């Protein structure tokens, strides 16, 4: 296991934990699972997990991006990844993937992104933003219709989310910002026929 830091889009250094088998080559040939969360000030502390061993034994690298929105670097780190700074969370994660490619841990199209709940929001946003970076995405209970949820104050969790994501119903700035990244609102459906011209 190694801990490195990489530069994000704005020059901030972001921690990244990389776990791999000692026989796994760093020549760009390995598949890689990149985990991220980045919300509510929850830190993704490095820890042992026996469930990861099956992947690591198969030459799959496990990396955890300690992106803004968590509190790995304190309260300011959290604030730089919430409300109208939420896009820093997504940029940090995308730059983690780019760092792993540039440093030959993996290659473009060999990364599986993984996150759940608010980490599912992260997955939806980053796959919309940089689809070519990923082989696939694993979303566990994803929060992908974040704008519609935020607009419905009758839902039991919505009002409690205002401190993290903002209040889109009563604040146009928050509405516009959430709309700009909300996975559901930013999906495009492409269809084609066998001979589209």
Please place each PLM-identified region on the residue numbering.
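Cap/lid segment of the alpha/beta-hydrolase catalytic domain
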Residues: 1-109, 116
């Amino acid at each position: 296991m190694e801990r490195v830091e990489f530069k994000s889009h704005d020059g901030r250094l972001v921690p990244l934990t990389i776990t791999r088998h000692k026989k796994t080559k760093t020549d760009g040939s390995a598949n890689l699972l990149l985990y991220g969360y980045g919300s509510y000030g929850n830190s993704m502390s490095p820890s042992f997990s026996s469930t990861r061993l099956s992947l690591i034994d198969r030459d799959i690298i496990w990396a955890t991006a300690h992106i803004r929105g968590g509190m790995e670097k304190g309260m300011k780190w959290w604030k730089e990844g919430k409300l109208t700074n939420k896009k820093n969370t997504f940029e940090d994660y995308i730059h983690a993937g780019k760092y792993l490619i540039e440093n030959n841990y993996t290659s473009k199209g060999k990364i599986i992104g993984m996150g759940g709940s608010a980490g599912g929001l992260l997955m939806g946003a980053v796959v919309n933003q940089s689809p070519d970076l990923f082989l696939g995405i694993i979303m566990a209970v994803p929060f992908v219709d974040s704008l519609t949820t935020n607009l419905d104050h009758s839902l039991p969790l919505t009002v409690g989310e205002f401190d993290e994501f903002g209040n889109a119903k009563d604040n146009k700035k928050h509405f516009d910002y959430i709309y700009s990244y909300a996975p559901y609102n930013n999906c495009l459906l492409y269809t084609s026929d066998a001979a589209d011209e």
